[in-house]
């Protein structure tokens, strides 16, 4: 895949970034170099390689999944202007 100057300008416009002709031309080369590197990475055979999230083997700390009410209902609604039975009262928006 290669990027042309029109694609760079279109992406810049979508991202709301001001890019002049000189910058667009420079970015075209840079983006093509990046995409070339990604294509090289796609050629690497990773068959049998487990995906990893860290270079050091780690395990996530697990906790018991217990359903609770949080025991903080009073604290949560303490600063609300209007409440009823631990619920926020808000003005009706839709008729």
Swiss-Prot record:
Gene3D superfamilies cross-referenced by the UniProt entry: Glu-tRNAGln amidotransferase C subunit, N-terminal domain
GO biological process: glutaminyl-tRNAGln biosynthesis via transamidation; regulation of translational fidelity; translation
Major enzyme class: ligase
One Pfam family linked to the record: GatC
This protein's UniProt keywords: ATP-binding, Ligase, Nucleotide-binding, Protein biosynthesis
InterPro entries: Asp/Glu-ADT_sf_sub_c (IPR036113), GatC (IPR003837)
Catalytic function, reaction form: L-glutamyl-tRNA(Gln) + L-glutamine + ATP + H2O = L-glutaminyl-tRNA(Gln) + L-glutamate + ADP + phosphate + H(+); L-aspartyl-tRNA(Asn) + L-glutamine + ATP + H2O = L-asparaginyl-tRNA(Asn) + L-glutamate + ADP + phosphate + 2 H(+)
Enzyme Commission number(s) from the entry: 6.3.5.-
Any one GO molecular function term: asparaginyl-tRNA synthase (glutamine-hydrolyzing) activity
Family statement drawn from the similarity comment of this UniProt entry: Belongs to the GatC family.
Task of the protein: Allows the formation of correctly charged Asn-tRNA(Asn) or Gln-tRNA(Gln) through the transamidation of misacylated Asp-tRNA(Asn) or Glu-tRNA(Gln) in organisms which lack either or both of asparaginyl-tRNA or glutaminyl-tRNA synthetases. The reaction takes place in the presence of glutamine and ATP through an activated phospho-Asp-tRNA(Asn) or phospho-Glu-tRNA(Gln).
HAMAP family: GatC
Subunit structure: Heterotrimer of A, B and C subunits.
PANTHER family (UniProt xref): GLUTAMYL-TRNA(GLN) AMIDOTRANSFERASE SUBUNIT C, MITOCHONDRIAL
Protein name, UniProt field: Aspartyl/glutamyl-tRNA(Asn/Gln) amidotransferase subunit C
Organism: Chelativorans sp. (strain BNC1)
Gene, per the UniProt record: gatC
